[in-house]
Amino acid sequence: MKNGMGTSSVVSVKARLNRIGCMIVALVLVAGSRVSAAQTRTAQIRTVDTALATLRLDGENGDLIGVHWKSPDLEVIAEPRLGENFRLVLPQPGNEGNYFNSRDQSVSKIEPTPDGVLCTYDSLTNNRETVALKVRYRIRAAGEQLQFSIEVDNPTDRKISEVMYGIIGGQRGIGDRLDTESLIPSWSTNLAPNLFSRFNGGGYGGGNLGIRYDAGTFTYPGAMPMGWMDVYNAKAGLGYYYANQDLETRVMSLEVELHPFSKSASVRDSWPTPAEAGGEPLGITIGWVNFPYVSHGTFTAGPVALQVHGGDWHVASHIYRSWYDQHFAIDRPPDWLRKENAWQSIILSNSEDVVVHRFNELPKLAADAKQYGITTFEILGWDMGGIDRGYPQYRPNPHLGTPEEFKKALADIRALGVHPLIFSNIQFADTATPLFRDKLQQYAVDGRWAPDLSLHGWGEGTISARSGMTRSYMTLVSPAHPEFRQFLMAQYLDLVRDGAEGFQLDKTNDLGWLDFNPRLPVSPDKSLPQGVLETLKELLPAARAINPNFSLASEMWFDRALPYIDVSYMRMGEIDMDSTAFRYTFPEWTATIFGESPGDINPMNNGMRYGFVWDLAPRHYNDSVDEPLTRPLAQYVSELIRIRKEFQDLLFFGRFNDTMGANVQGGPDVRYSVFKSRDPRSTDVASVIVNLGDAPESATLNIDGVSGDVTVAAPDQPDRRATLPVRISVPAHRLAIVVKRASDN
């Protein structure tokens, strides 16, 4: 025994693959082209036994063709013919999609290690060439996980553009395939809930053009705020976690594929039957993809982790958070911004030169907000050019008043006991300005084939601008360039000196790009994510040297940014969060939820349900919260603030527990959530019950394993006592809170 783990044993067995249920059909796909005919062959199977799982490797190419997890018992790979280790792309002139796939190689060595196996490839070959790339591919048991890592030596002057590894091919679900669910979490949605029943590929580029199977790709950071997914069968109480646990911050993608095809317009099941597959291998392949663009050097990536677990995705969430906490520190006392229950956001001027408010009007607007308990005041469109124009010229717009009037307005807002929060950006520049043309264009994010600009724009002040025909455009500019970061930092610190107590940095979630600017000091995959994080890291201590209470909000839900930001800036106008995985994984995290229209009562209810910050932007950021149509909404938010402050240890600073720990029976428009204390010694629990419908509803609440007295709170009503199980009447578009304290017993 070594480190508590048994030494691997490697056994060679000569056998036809019908011993594991099939014949290997070698289908080598290079950029969607078949490069060798389907063939059957006799293969040497190498069995590797680890403490966690028994691995089966193809003895000729080293591919992982079987994973039998020991406890819980699960065969992860059901179709060995889809087993793979890696795919690499080494472009050559006239052939950008020059793939080298592990299934097309002859592995040089398969070596047992104390905790797994190392496959070495001394060179790589395809039907065009043999290249001197050396690959070391490692699979090891570490704790409760199988971990996959890759090392590629590239002595050539050609850059490796893609490395897909940690591939788990041939998956067919857990137990009943149609009962198998999947979670690829975004900030509020599940990007792929039904991989094993309603696979829906083609969500990028040319769809599924260029390949014979169906596939989808999800970028981290980008659509994915966290680097993990989960496959689970709730009925079976079993799942497996699959995650990129590489500490290097760079753009990566999760590739998911269904072989050999999926069916469109299917009622329940988009998978082909075995008969429809016609003997071709059938199953899901997943893998993580890096874009290193490295030559004359060594690229390493990993680990990618696989872990079988009991339960559903909530268990996987804890696995990821446990790993995250070993490397990133976000557990800190909440500062003033994280303690704020509600904001108002207002735009002073837009990109079509419409002046809505001037600097000298801001204190009155902030005073209007405060009378409803709203004490954070976000100011947008204050700078040169108005909202979404003129960036990054972060100086007061002279059409709105003088710099002195701007500073006085911020001082007067602070004197009211309201926090001025200034809207700004990091990685965007208006392409129409002399500043961009003469100075900043050299830092722009460049395309692969030409210095193509990625254009973004949001018009507001005219119909043609709103419809996209005459809007002002901005492009991505990378803060990975130290000179550009310094340019931003000087302006940011001037704003702090002017009296800003914090920033809301907008559009910072736009990170999933490769940047081929030749001036970059980093590789294309690191430009935006590392540049933006470095900006946040530099800004906080520099700003706090001026104002120790300076705080950051940002339109970002990238988990590696959470050490720096206190509130994410987001909207959620849907009835439900399609996935609560990000909120559940990071209970410290919260985000804004907007009320832009006087009728946005249900988003405010959802703010309580999910523990979000209420952000009123009356009449689409134009008016005071005290304007006549918005006044009832503001009064309702004031009541919600009152209730949440009363139980803030649970409802705002506690652990969002999704719907676990309680059960609510009610009509189809009733929703609920559960909050628990983050103090492990506490048994206190709260449930938020929301009626999103147009008619009154009654609901019955039970809290798991708990009986006795509870407190019931509701807007515009005094708190009352009740006994579990409690039946509650909830008016249309209203909510109720039920709180159980240990002291109630």
Sequence positions of predicted segments:
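Bacterial N-terminal signal peptides
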Residues: 21-32
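Polysaccharide-binding surfaces and accessory modules of carbohydrate-active proteins
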Residues: 39-49, 53, 73-120, 135-142, ...
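Beta-strand-rich recognition/accessory modules
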Residues: 47-49, 155, 211-336, 359
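Carbohydrate-binding surface patches
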Residues: 227, 231, 237-241, 250, ...
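Aromatic-lined carbohydrate-binding/catalytic grooves of carbohydrate-active enzymes
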Residues: 340-489, 500-502, 510-523
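Glycan-recognition surfaces
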Residues: 435-474, 478-480, 530-631
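Aromatic- and carboxylate-lined catalytic core of secreted/periplasmic carbohydrate-active enzymes
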Residues: 605-683
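C-terminal beta-strand-rich structural cap/linker in extracellular carbohydrate-active enzymes
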Residues: 721-745
